[in-house]
Amino acid sequence: MGRSSKSVRLLAGVITLVAVLVAPTAVSGAAPSGPTGGSAAARWAASHDGPQPHAGVNVSWDVPIRMSDGTVLRANVYRPADARERPTSTKTPVIVNMTPYTKLVSSIGSAVTQHPVLEPFLLQLARSINLSGTPIDGINDIAHTIRDGGAKTFLVDFDLVRSGYTQVVVDVRGTGFSQGKWDVFQDREQRDTVEVIDWASKQRWSNGKVGMSGVSYSAINQIQAANKNPKALKAIFPVEPGGDLIRDIVAPGGALGVGFLPLWLTLVNTTKMIPNVASMLNGTFDWKWLADRIADPLTFYPQLLAGLFTPDIASVPPELKELLETDSEPRTAWLDRAENITTPTFIYGGWFDLFTNSEVRMYNKIPLPPGKKQLIMGDGYHLTIGGGQQGRAGSPPRLDVLQKAWFDKWLKGIDNGIDSYGPVNLKQVGDSWITARQFPRAGMERQRLYLSDRRSGTAPYAVRDGSLTPTAPQSRARMTVAPGLAPVCSRDAAQQMAGALAIFPGCSDDARISERAALTFTTPPLTTTRSVSGYSNVRLNTVLDATDGYWTATLNDVAPDGTSKVITSGQVVASLRGYDRATSQFAPNGDVIDPFYNLTLSTRQRVAPGRPVSIDIGLLPTEAIVKPGHRLRVDVFAMNFPRGLPLRPLLNESGLRPQHIQLDPNRPSFVNLPVSTPIG
């Protein structure tokens, strides 16, 4: 009896010891749950926000990095340090950020937003800003990028550095304090990025493992570096990356991106002229830098001006012509080639970002297993990184938290569960966040909804109020729409201007103003909830009075009170309607659902005035919920300024004449949608 009792006590002791030893491991290994990441995300946040092994940050300013052609780039190097800013002697992983916006901006922004006194004040200010219900309540989302961690992915994250990383911020060639001519993502600039990665891996403070971080431009060059698979590059965290710059922002659908390009080019070409004042004071001014700036003061402006002012096709200059041919050096350099990437990649994008066209394509092309590649798609704009939602209840963790967890996994080998997150987290337009295995989500059915001239009674203010029906109309009708400026107040305008116009929600959140220049086609109220997940296409049977025209279509969610919110949109210049069948996607019935436009002069197809021509308008991919009582609507416009403006020769050929949809039972006009349950 005594021996038995002793055995029981011994067994109980062993079980208790095992429980004590195993329990922390079990908790730390708990898999992330849903979009929020569950308890795993709480540990990621604690790892980022809690006490760090290093108290300070040591900065080396304007470190020279010589490229293989002799050009010198300049970098700021941020290293973990003690409280007196003495750098650690321990070798660390390195995070590289290549920026065209001058590292001066990054250093000032980081110093202000992460100052020990100013940071709490700014965070509290961001939390306290609430302009909801005012004409400028879109400012809320911009302010919340500080709270949501988006700002730290653009700037330098001092918490990340103090946790044991070195961050290197480099002015790309021809910008900031770096020598050379700004190459705008082309081959020489891409080679620079690879050489910087190699340089960073071999410094005395580096352990040889390199990651990359950054937003927008600094996300695109991450993708470009990763597709070359440099040996030292172990992980990337691109926020809002583009993968096909012609189709994303330069000329989506063949229309010049006038709402974004002039302002962006002016920003970079202006800031690259800011001299290194410190070098002027200490006698080390770089005269080669000055000579390079004088030689190339307005990079890419000749192409922009040619697109705006060249009167006809015969007069198109070489610098513009090369952008309008598939095999030209810029066009090939601007493709993501994500199918070559083997580096763990975490992509953050948005349904109303500048680069929505590319973000999900990129994720799907990367030949890595889910987990080693991750995708988050929010519903914010380019400037509202995180959309004011990250870190809130029901939403993914803050971006700075996710970024550190990603680097901890792939650069430090910490088994924190980030590779079990997602792999695809999607903000459903009109609803909440969901986690999926893929995008588009499985289980969608393709459905045609046909454009009809029968009045829906929901848009009396539109040019024409039509219906959207599950069966094709049996009568013929012609509906005419003329180019107009109402889309200046629209979600497309807000999207093209990176979200700057979204501070006025009356334009971005309700399409009824822009619909005054549109033909609208609306369903009856839905009786059950429908999901829309994937690519949609609007097929129009058109007639033009000129040899060219410009078509835009949007898919909208119309609430019972009449509010019309754009879910997704697309556009195409009529003569550039041709698409590459090998790259485009098709529905089982043969309908094109994702036309990959050629956008070249050599494949241009002028329209015969007065003759019907079928036009396919591919809409950007989306994930949306349409609730009972709401309606779906297709809007059709003949102009979409400032989202786009046809190249001047094509605009001149259009004459800005009215454009017609010819409704014909033999050549129906329709939208092909990916829906959870057929409508009607």
Model-derived features: where do they sit?
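Accessory cap/linker subdomain of secreted extracellular hydrolases
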Residues: 46-48, 100-162, 227-341
